[in-house]
Amino acid sequence: AVRRGTLQEHPTVWSLDLGGGLICVRQYDTILFSSKPPQQQVSYTYRLSLPDSRLELWEIGKAMTMTVLERESFALQGEDSGKMSAWFDSDELVLPLTIRSRLPGDTIRVMGLNGSKKVKDIFIDDKIPSSERSAIPLVCDGSGNIVWIPGVRRSMHAAVGRHTASVLLLTLEELEKSGET
């Protein structure tokens, strides 16, 4: 059964209980043999207000930093800082921001697309393994709109434009583990 499942083109995601506490999981191009069940999604919600500059998300081992820059500083830094950072027009962004885990039915108005798209469909289209999806936080504005999926997509809300006076930079990074040398 394992050989057949690994050689078949579809389905691209599956798991098989091998007995004795072992499982075999296929996630797109990866085959994993494990003695523990896949990690269940941890539910969390945090508020990120402007005076705060760093928020630690212990549930997923990451930290979110927030920096406000004037237009001139933003122009010097440039907008290309990778998928783990996002720039927003701070005057257009509805505060406070909320960082939370994914919920069933979540949608985002993706920059460059007309209309909205389900977060689950974006994860599937980008071939993000289901075991990694719970570690990706969603950043929502004060109206509840998802404005950024770190490492994945940014929404069209509060996009930086030529009339932007100040810019809010959000960055997601790995939490440094204490006690390691």
List each language-model region with its residue ranges.
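AMP-forming adenylation/ATP pyrophosphatase catalytic core
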Residues: 1-181
